[in-house]
C-alpha cells in the first residue's frame, strides 16, 4: 500500500506534467519545402476536392483547418478536434495531405489519396511521419 506522502508526490507530479503539456507548443513543420516532382500546393482543407476531403475526415476524424485552434496536447482546453490540416496538394494523379494530431502523443501524419474514374477517393497511404521533413517523407510515399 502506498503512503500518503508518496501518493501526494505522485499527484503533484501528475498535475505538473498536465500543466506543462498545455504550455508545450508543437514544432511547426517546414511549409516552404518543395516536393521533388511537380506539385500544386494548397493551404486549406477547403481547397481539397470534396471526395478527398470526405475520405480524409472519414479516415482521420474531425479536423481543424490550418491556423485554427485544435487540441494539440492531452489537456482539452475547449471543444475542438485533435487533428489539424497543415498542407496538401496534387502530384500527378494523387493528392497528399499533411495533418498534425494532438493528444497524449503529438505527431504529423501523411495521407495519400487517389480519385478513381467515378470520382471516388481512395486512401493509397496513411502513415505517421517518422522524419521532420514532410516533403522528403511524402516523396518517399509517392515513389
Sequence positions of predicted segments:
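Bacterial N-terminal signal peptides that target proteins for export
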Residues: 1-7
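Bacterial N-terminal signal peptides
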Residues: 8-16
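Flexible low-complexity loop/turn motifs enriched in small/helix-breaking residues
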Residues: 18-93, 126-143
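Exposed beta-strand-loop-beta-strand "reactive/processing" segments of non-cytosolic proteins
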Residues: 83-112
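Generic "edge-of-domain/loop-turn" microfeature
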Residues: 104, 120, 130-132
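Residue-level detector of beta-propeller blades
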Residues: 109, 122-124
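Short loop/turn segments immediately following beta-strands, especially the blade-tip
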Residues: 115-121
Amino acid at each position: 500500500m502506498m503512503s500518503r506522502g508518496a501518493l501526494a508526490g505522485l499527484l503533484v507530479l501528475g498535475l505538473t506534467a498536465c500543466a506543462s503539456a498545455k504550455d508545450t507548443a508543437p514544432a511547426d513543420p517546414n511549409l516552404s519545402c518543395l516536393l521533388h516532382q511537380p506539385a500544386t500546393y494548397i493551404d486549406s482543407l477547403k481547397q481539397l476536392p470534396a471526395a478527398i476531403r470526405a475520405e480524409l475526415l472519414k479516415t482521420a476524424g474531425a479536423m481543424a483547418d490550418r491556423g485554427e485552434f485544435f487540441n494539440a496536447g492531452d489537456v482539452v482546453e475547449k471543444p475542438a478536434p485533435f487533428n489539424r490540416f497543415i498542407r496538401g496538394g496534387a502530384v500527378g494523379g494523387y493528392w497528399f495531405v499533411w495533418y498534425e494530431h494532438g493528444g497524449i502523443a503529438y505527431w504529423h501524419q501523411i495521407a495519400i489519396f487517389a480519385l478513381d474514374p467515378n470520382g471516388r477517393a481512395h486512401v493509397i497511404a496513411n502513415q505517421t511521419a517518422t522524419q521532420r521533413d514532410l516533403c522528403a517523407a511524402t516523396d518517399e510515399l509517392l515513389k
